[in-house]
């Protein structure tokens, strides 16, 4: 019998185990031979008696004895091999099961990547200076006093800095208009985009000049297009814009983006000056709504145990109950559906006009890994429920600050050879934030932080309970995780992406809470969660070059090359006898948009410092993904 080595036991242990079984078989053989001789004697006697009636000969008697002996040895061989298979379930094999095939880690594996909301907005530099008629320079007078009317934002001292140097001096009319322009610039610099200063028609007497400030505001908001949800929420956004007097750019941007963030809603705004009120502006919101969204795709990012081909599909309904809610389903299966099944449903609901959202999700996953783990009859399942409250403290095109608080309830169990091997029931409270922004160098940045705390509540498995995924793991753990990302334009069509992810734990963790390296995000030449630990650090650098072929069936193309590295630290030694593990890889690839709906990537990756556990080598590997959205 040939047993494939998968890191479960070294060859000396295999040899020792096999030699013990061979010795046992030899002793059993001797005993069975003695029994067979006795059986032979009795069978001969029985046959002689039967020959009196049936005329059997000696040859038939020998065949009967041989069949009896072969059947007996077959039973012993089957029993021996069953015992031998069970002996192969070593700590190393158990570790590999919980790294790459345990359903408790699928939630993290299939989680959608968080992307920055900020974007670089093209802005043309304002190099144009106002041009005034030359005749203005000829109109000169002694400036004794300047009156600024109409401002509700700034006090007199703020304005006096702008014209103090001109007082009690001879000035021309052009200089007066320049002062008005400086007041306008001051308002615009502070975000009052509709406000301005003007010099009204007047007769200058005794050196007194008046400048009027027109503080712009929103007078009316109208909506065009189909509205799928209640107008009550839209009215709240409308009132917020009307309250912003004078109108600030950050208020206009925030509430327009919050409307655009509603599920299935895409909005454009048109600003027009009012014909009846000075300083008033009317806003028209043009709605484009989508009732549902979906996608279907395939990739080979699975493992030999679960995959490698994965088929994923998702669909979400927007405002199905006419309340601006979003309801969605996601599913992932492998080509052999018994090896992996993952299903997730979610519900998201806005609960305030300031962008606060309530989010529910529930997922179920099932795993019966194949390949070298198939003979161990590994079977696991996981159920996760999540409740989260999110709020955008800052929402704009160039800067966003989001906070959240959440609760996760996760139950998972794994059986090996039909026996319960582990059972984790975790109750976790999360608190976190994410901040993304565009800096002065036109780089897009993302920083996120998450604090997770486990509690022994609601029938959780307590620390020290038997049959945990990691016997020393804590269910009442505390850990912090974080991510950093920067996307920098180097030149037209050239970009450099840098990304860092980390985790620090104050306790020994259970398997589903460990930091994993390997898979589509970090350690791309390796399988998902190739190495795991209580603490971890991973980073990648990716150079990107964009092309625009503008072909009918090839809209966009991006070539890239990357290097990534990851390391994990454990608070206790692993079964390999080490507290640290690391890996690195490099690769090249292309991303493409075939049409507006179909996209994908192809890449070739090379493991560098360690072998891929499931492959047993460091050969290059090819990966692909193809997705259709509708």
Name each model feature, range by range:
Residues 413-557, 562-565, 569-571:
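C-terminal outer-membrane beta-barrel translocator/porin domains of Gram-negative envelope proteins
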Residues 271, 296-300, 313, 329-333, ...:
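Transmembrane beta-barrel strands of outer-membrane/channel proteins
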Residues 283, 313-315, 345, 387, ...:
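Membrane-embedded beta-strands of outer-membrane beta-barrel proteins
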Residues 267, 292-294, 321-327, 353-359, ...:
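Repeated loop/turn-to-beta-strand initiation elements of outer-membrane beta-barrel proteins
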Residues 279, 307-311, 339-343, 381-385, ...:
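Residues that define the transmembrane beta-barrel architecture of outer-membrane proteins
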Residues 315, 592, 618-630:
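Outer-membrane beta-barrel "beta-signal"
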Residues 88-302, 332-341, 480, 500:
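Periplasmic polypeptide-binding modules associated with outer-membrane biogenesis and secretion
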Residues 299-301, 331-332, 371-376, 415-421, ...:
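Extracellular loop and loop/strand-boundary signature of outer-membrane beta-barrel proteins
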């Amino acid at each position: 019998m040939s047993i494939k080595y998968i890191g479960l036991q070294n060859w000396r242990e295999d040899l020792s185990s096999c030699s013990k079984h061979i010795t046992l078989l030899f002793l059993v053989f001797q005993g069975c031979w003695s029994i067979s001789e006795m059986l032979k004697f009795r069978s001969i006697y029985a046959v002689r008696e039967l020959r009196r009636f049936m005329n059997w000969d000696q040859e038939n008697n020998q065949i009967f004895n041989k069949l009896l002996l072969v059947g007996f040895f077959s039973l012993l061989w089957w029993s021996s091999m069953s015992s031998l298979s069970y002996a192969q379930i070593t700590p190393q094999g158990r570790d590999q099961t919980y790294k790459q095939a345990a359903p408790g880690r699928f939630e993290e594996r299939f989680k959608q990547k968080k992307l920055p909301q900020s974007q670089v907005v093209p802005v043309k530099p304002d190099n144009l200076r106002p041009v005034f008629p030359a005749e203005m320079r000829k109109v000169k007078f002694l400036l004794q006093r300047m009156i600024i009317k109409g401002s509700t934002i700034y006090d007199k001292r703020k304005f006096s800095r702008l014209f103090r140097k001109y007082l009690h001096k001879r000035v021309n009319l052009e200089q007066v208009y320049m002062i008005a322009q400086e007041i306008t610039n001051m308002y615009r610099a502070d975000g009052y985009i509709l406000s301005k200063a003007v010099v009204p028609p007047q007769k200058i007497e005794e050196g007194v000049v008046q400048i009027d400030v027109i503080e712009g505001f929103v007078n009316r908001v109208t909506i065009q297009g189909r509205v799928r949800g209640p107008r009550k929420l839209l009215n709240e956004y409308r009132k917020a814009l009307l309250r912003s007097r004078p109108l600030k750019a950050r208020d206009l941007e925030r509430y327009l983006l919050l409307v655009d963030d509603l599920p299935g809603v895409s909005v454009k705004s048109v600003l027009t000056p009012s014909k009846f009120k000075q300083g008033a502006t009317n806003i028209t919101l043009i709605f484009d709504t989508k009732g549902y969204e979906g996608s279907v795709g395939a990739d080979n990012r699975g493992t030999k145990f679960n995959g490698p081909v994965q088929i994923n599909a998702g669909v979400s309904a927007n405002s199905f109950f006419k309340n601006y809610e979003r309801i969605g389903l996601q599913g992932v299966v492998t080509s052999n559906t018994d090896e992996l099944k993952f299903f997730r449903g979610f519900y998201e609901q806005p609960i305030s006009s300031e962008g606060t959202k309530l989010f529910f999700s529930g997922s179920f996953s099932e795993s019966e890994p194949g390949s070298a783990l198939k003979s161990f009859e590994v079977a696991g399942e996981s159920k996760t429920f999540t409740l989260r409250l999110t709020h955008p403290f800052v929402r704009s095109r160039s800067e966003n600050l989001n906070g959240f608080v959440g609760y996760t309830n996760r139950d998972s169990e794994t059986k090996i050879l039909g026996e319960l091997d582990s059972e984790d029931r975790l109750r976790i409270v999360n608190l976190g934030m994410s901040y993304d922004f565009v800096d002065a160098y036109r780089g897009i940045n993302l920083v996120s932080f998450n604090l997770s705390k486990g509690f022994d509540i609601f029938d959780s498995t307590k620390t020290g309970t038997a049959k945990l995924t990691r016997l020393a793991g804590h269910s009442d753990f505390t850990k912090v995780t974080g991510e950093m990302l920067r996307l920098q334009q180097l030149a037209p069509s050239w970009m450099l992406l840098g990304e860092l992810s980390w985790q620090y734990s104050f306790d020994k963790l259970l398997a589903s809470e460990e930091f994993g390296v390997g898979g589509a995000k970090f350690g791309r030449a390796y399988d998902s969660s190739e190495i795991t630990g209580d603490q971890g650090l991973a980073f990648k650098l990716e150079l990107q070059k964009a092309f625009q072929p503008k072909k009918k069936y090839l809209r966009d193309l991006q070539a890239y090359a990357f290097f990534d590295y990851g390391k994990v630290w454990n608070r206790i030694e692993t079964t390999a006898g080490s507290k640290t593990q690391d890996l690195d890889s490099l690769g090249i690839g292309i991303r493409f948009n075939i049409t507006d709906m179909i996209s994908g990537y192809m890449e070739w990756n090379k493991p560098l410092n360690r072998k891929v556990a499931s492959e047993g080598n460091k050969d290059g590997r090819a990966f692909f993904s193809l997705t259709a959205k509708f």
